[in-house]
Amino acid sequence: MQYQSFSPRQNATLFWWTKPEHQNRDGLICDGSIRSGKTVSMAIGFIMWSMASFDKQNFAICGRTIEALRRNVIVHIPTWLEGMFEVTERRSENKMVVTIGNRSNTYYLFGGRDESSYTLIQGITLAGVLFDEVALMPRSFVEQAMARCSVSGSKFWFNCNPESPGHWFYKEWIRKAAERNMLYLHFTMDDNLSLDEKIKARYEGMYSGVFYDRYIRGLWTVAEGLIYTMFNKDYHVVPVSYTHLR
């Protein structure tokens, strides 16, 4: 993909923290369709905000696994930040150091795979955290990472694709964004100016039903009707009497 200029929604993600009406917010939530440009604009915005606001502080960048985080985000950051910052990744320590002039900050990488993952982030003091694909992480991990943000001025940055409307993140953060003093931005594929129109049309033709609503429209919708389209009542429904067989 050849990166083009940023869309208005991406620019809002990059610079929201500079706007007087948003400077006192506790963070940013971006959700929406696949391939909508959330990840690139949020990663750049997070680094820009942290480097402009802090020096010699620790931050966390979290994904479902460190491997997925590296593949989807970290490996691209030197290119995305080229000409702005010097980026040094220390793979053996699962961290990267970003520098500009005499100012530098450290960004630790964490994976929130399961309920035990919260123990990995205990103890560290953070000035901010970015959650990439937060809906794939357990609540215990997310809340433990947020609890580490005790530095004055720290903020939370979340992005995700939609899941069920019963998902804890949707109920506790997206529906309560204003109550929690968060800025909420919803993305669609039209917000990604780098996405070719033919590719966009292909994605739109790949899905239907609940998956179209989630992946293309970026909506938190619940599955209805048959989950398995190959279902056959005569073949798959077992008579009650069969359940008594030993």
Identify the meaning behind each predicted range.
Residues 27-90:
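Conserved P-loop
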Residues 127-137:
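SF2 helicase catalytic motif II
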Residues 1-26:
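Pre-P-loop entry segment of helicase/translocase ATPase cores
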Residues 136-206:
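ASCE P-loop NTPase helicase motor core
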